[in-house]
Amino acid sequence: MVAINQKKLNQFLASDRVSFKGVEKENLRSDKDGRISNKSFPEAFGVHNFNSFVTLDYSQPHLEIVTPTFQDNSELYGFLGGLHAYVEQNLEGDLLWNYSMPPKFKGKFIKLPPYGKSNKTKLAHLYRLGLRNRYGDKMQSTAGIHFNISFSESVIKELNTTKTDLYLGICRNFLRMFPLVLRLIGCSPVAHRSFIKDRELSIDLLKEDENYLPKSTSLRVSRLGYYSEEQDEKFITFNTLGEYLNLIKDYINIPNKKFSEISLDLKKQVNNGTIQME
C-alpha cells in the first residue's frame, strides 16, 4: 500500500477544484398536519424513472434531489439551492419534511413507487419490496444526505498513489472518525411516538407525541433508525479491493437464516443473502 503525502493532500484539499462533488438529498413529503403524505409523485417532475434531478427513493413520499457533479463548491451550492426551491414550488400542497426521522405515520404501509416493466425497473421494485419485507416501512422512512466525491486523475498522480488505495484509505479514515462526525453534525435526537410504537427501547418522553434519547445526536444511525442487526453482525474491511469484493459476494450469495424465511418463489425479495445486491 502506497503512503500518501499528508502535506500535499492538505494543499490539494485547500483548493475546491481538485475534486468533483455532488449531493443526493432525501426528504419525505408531508402534509400540512405533519403526517407522511400519501400523494403520488408530483406531475411537474415527470416520470421519476427518467428524471435525473428529482426522483424517488424507497417510497412515493420519499423524494430525492440529485445534483450533477461540480468542481466549484459555490456552483454546487447554487445548483442545489435552485433545484430545492423549484421542488418546493411544485409539491402540490405538500411540504418537505426537514428531519432525518420521519413525521407521524398514517397507516401500516407507505406506498412503493411504480417502476415500469423493464428488467431494470422490475429489479428496482423487487429490491425495495425486499427491504419492506426484511425491515418494515418504518426503517425505510428515515432520510439522509449523500455527499459524493471523487478526485481528478492529476491529483491521484501527484499524490503518488492509486485510485483504489486512495478511496480505500478515505473509507478507513471516515470510519475511524465516524463517532466524531456524528457528535459534531448529527441532528436527529427526536422521533415521533408512532415511529417507535411497539418497540422495546429505553427512550424518554419529550412531549406527548415525541420521544428523544438524552445527549443523542443522531437517532437515524442508531439502533432506532436505519439499522440492521443482521448486517451489523457482519464485518466489512477496506484493506484491499479483493478482500472487500469477496466479503460483499459472500454476503449476497450465502443464505441468511432469518431472510431465508421470506419467500423467494413469491418474489418478495431479490435473494436471501444478508444483502440483496451490491
Regions found by a protein language model. Give the residues of each.
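Loop-rich catalytic cores of soluble enzymes, especially ATP-dependent carboxylate-amine ligases
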Residues: 105, 116-134, 141, 150-278
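Terminal catalytic/cofactor-binding subdomain
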Residues: 1-132, 139-145, 165-172, 179
